[in-house]
């Protein structure tokens, strides 16, 4: 019968394998994060372009598309580096399924851009299409990161993933407000969606700050200083208090987009800090677990050497 020690050794080996997977996927997570950030900006510029009836923002949108395409190539290279021939665990099966779905979304992106460029779609449909693609990419991150048993790492993972989701709600807020200002008129459905995006991002960010380290919380406090958020809050009040059918100043489009972008860019810096902290925790835990495993294996070797052998 196998001893308790043999199962402890197996548990440590399994934990190390999970931590190694998490460490190896950090490059993939970083590449996806950069692409998502670019697509969020592309979505906002697309809505400015559509809301202005194609009269403005065309050049800015195309420049952002080019940047997104370069970052998409980085993500696809990261996907290509994954070993799809190795024996599949349940985790890798789910991860590869998420990647397949994300690649389908990326393959449809040129057609989405074409429809936006030709103004075949409205702003609401465009926001939804980009949101589906971004959610597919974030699902890859969620699955890639879901491989840790250590409670500290798990807590940081929950904080990190909630932050990513909160940032996506901030991106949808930017896109929806961009369309409203560019169109110059408030409508009920868009206003309700805007309120939903604001409330949802605040909820996700609260979960993140509740679980994050003191260093991350301090970074977030700095990003939330009144002088940083005042322009955004002022523009939010305009959008949230203008009655349905009321006129919006299209000249505020640039100010809104810039205020949201400063906020989201600051969030990207915090996202990078969260990812770096998570990677550091993973490395520390990997080193400690490797030492524990080595000690257990020495113990097992000593026990084996001490057993009497048969004389026949």
Which residue ranges define each predicted feature?
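Hydrophobic alpha-helical segments
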Residues: 1-312
């Amino acid at each position: 019968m196998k001893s308790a020690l043999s199962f402890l050794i197996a548990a440590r080996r399994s934990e190390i394998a999970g931590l190694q997977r998490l460490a190896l996927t950090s490059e993939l997570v970083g590449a996806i994060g950069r692409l998502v950030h670019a697509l969020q900006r592309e979505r906002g510029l697309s809505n400015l372009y559509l809301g202005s009836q194609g009269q403005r923002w065309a050049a800015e949108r195309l420049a952002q598309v080019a940047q997104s395409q370069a970052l998409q190539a980085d993500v696809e290279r990261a996907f290509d580096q994954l070993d799809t021939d190795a024996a599949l665990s349940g985790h890798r099966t789910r991860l590869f399924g998420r990647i397949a779905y994300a690649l389908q979304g990326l393959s449809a992106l040129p057609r989405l851009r074409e429809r936006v460029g030709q103004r075949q779609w409205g702003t609401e449909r465009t926001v939804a299409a980009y949101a589906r693609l971004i959610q597919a990419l974030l699902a890859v991150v969620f699955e890639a990161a879901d491989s840790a048993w250590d409670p500290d790492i798990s807590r940081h993972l929950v904080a990190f993933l909630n932050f990513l989701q909160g940032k996506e709600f901030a991106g949808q807020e930017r896109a929806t407000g961009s369309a409203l200002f560019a169109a110059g008129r408030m409508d009920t459905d868009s206003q309700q969606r805007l309120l939903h995006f604001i409330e949802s991002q605040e909820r996700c960010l609260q979960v993140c700050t509740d679980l994050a380290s003191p260093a991350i919380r301090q970074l977030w406090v700095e990003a939330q200083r009144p002088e940083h958020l005042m322009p955004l809050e002022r523009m939010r009040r305009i959008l949230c208090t203008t009655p349905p059918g009321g006129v919006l100043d299209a000249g505020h489009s640039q100010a809104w987009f810039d205020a949201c972008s400063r906020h989201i860019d600051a969030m990207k810096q915090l996202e990078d800090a969260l990812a770096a902290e998570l990677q550091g925790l993973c490395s520390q835990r990997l080193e400690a677990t490797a030492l524990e495993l080595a000690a257990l294996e020495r113990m097992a070797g000593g026990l084996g050497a001490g057993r009497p052998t048969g004389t026949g």
